[in-house]
Curated annotation (Swiss-Prot):
It comes from the Eukaryota. GO terms for biological process: negative regulation of cytokinin-activated signaling pathway; regulation of phenylpropanoid metabolic process. The keyword Repeat applies. It holds the Pfam family Kelch_1. Transmembrane segments: none annotated. GO terms for cellular component: cytosol; SCF ubiquitin ligase complex. This is F-box/kelch-repeat protein At1g80440. It comes from Arabidopsis thaliana (Mouse-ear cress). Residues 2-49 form the F-box domain. Kelch repeats lie at residues 63-110, 115-163, 166-213, 215-263.
Length: 354
């Protein structure tokens, strides 16, 4: 059966490749052949290779009072905002079914293929830890419930994705506020969790990135340290299924008291702290830029080809409804361009290319 009557399939496929991601659910509903075509992993690879893919900045963001009162909300309601970087268009994802009070507070967001994964967090009413996993498909524009996180209910854990198939989780604390050494991996396609060997030390409020085939867990603090963030890091090699040796002074040059927002791109590791953009070069951190002065408390940082994206909150005493501040930096010229942003405090974010 032809994809489009009276057109060669390669021409019809080119038409589908040029479609906006927002049209995918409609395309998939037209017929089985189109549904099958856009569901293939090769379809996404071809979109990227032909430069028809769209880059989406996805944020967990507090809903702003529509009346514009400017009041600080004691327990804000969070939703998922999406920026299509090519057009500058902001949209919102449909709410997660059954989550009438918005997203779990402090949940983690990661992307795997064309899916957005929402993990854990705290119940907005009871503040009890969630072990929930929700998966949003940008191909169908629908949510599904994933397998719950096994073991103790944890919050404030480090989380990263290999961008292809799996999500890795480490550290955080349990419901007794005890920091954890445990780690695990979620296979999105199989909807299955598997425990990893434990880390060398407890890591509450740690940061995590996936880089060069390794899951890196950075900073955090042990139960007895309570907020005294470690400068150490350790990495898990997914090919050998082993943790490497502890790196004692990985963050020794930061001068910061928390684990800084960190990201990876093109084999390079970046972090933001103290108003500076830092890059890990030759086994040490080096300053490569300065964050614009009106960005307070960086909540998310990402690097894309040739550019750095920084999202933060605007003022030191800002309420949850305060306008988010975002910038894109051209890495070749170090020039910052301000983003048009939604209002509302940002807790988490991720990038997805579809």
């Amino acid at each position: 059966m032809e994809l489009i009557p009276n057109l060669p399939d390669d021409v019809a496929r080119e038409c589908l490749l040029r479609s906006s991601y927002q049209q995918f659910p409609v395309i998939a509903s037209v017929c089985r052949a189109w549904n099958r075509e856009v569901s293939l992993s090769q379809f996404l690879h071809q979109r990227k290779a032909s430069r028809h893919s769209q880059e989406l900045l996805i944020l967990s963001q507090a809903r702003v009072d529509p009346a514009g009162s400017g009041k600080i909300i004691a327990t804000p309601e969070y939703r998922i905002s999406v920026l299509e970087s090519g057009s500058g268009l902001w949209t919102e994802l449909p709410p997660i079914p059954g989550q009438t009070k918005g997203l779990p507070l402090f949940c983690r967001l990661v992307s795997v293929g064309s899916d957005l994964i929402v993990l854990g967090g705290l119940d907005p009413i009871t503040w009890q830890a969630h072990d929930s996993v929700f998966v949003f498909s940008f191909l169908t524009s629908k949510w599904r419930v994933g397998a719950t996180m096994p073991g103790v209910r944890r919050s404030f854990f480090g989380c990263a994705s290999d961008s292809d198939r799996t999500v890795l989780v480490a550290g955080g604390h349990n419901e007794e506020k005890c920091a954890l050494t445990s780690a695990m991996v979620y296979d999105v396609s199989e909807d299955k969790w598997t425990f990893l060997p434990d880390m060398a030390r407890e890591r509450d409020e740690c940061k995590a990135v996936f880089h060069a085939g390794r899951f890196h867990v950075i900073g955090g603090y042990a139960t007895e340290e309570q907020g005294q963030f470690s400068k150490t890091a350790e990495s898990f090699d997914v090919s050998t299924w082993e943790w490497g040796p502890l790196t004692e002074d990985f963050l020794d040059d930061t001068g910061d008291t928390v684990s800084p927002p960190t990201c990876v791109a093109g084999g390079d590791l970046y972090a933001c702290w103290g108003g500076d953009v830092m890059m890990f070069l030759n086994d040490k951190w080096q300053k490569v830029g300065q964050i614009p002065a009106d960005v307070y408390n960086v909540t998310y940082v990402a690097v894309r080809p040739g550019m750095l994206i920084v999202i933060g909150n605007g003022k030191a005493l800002a309420g949850y409804g305060e306008a988010t501040v975002g910038y894109i930096c051209d890495l070749s010229s170090s020039r910052w361009v301000k983003l048009e942003t939604h209002g509302g405090h940002v807790q988490a974010g991720c990038f997805l290319e579809v």
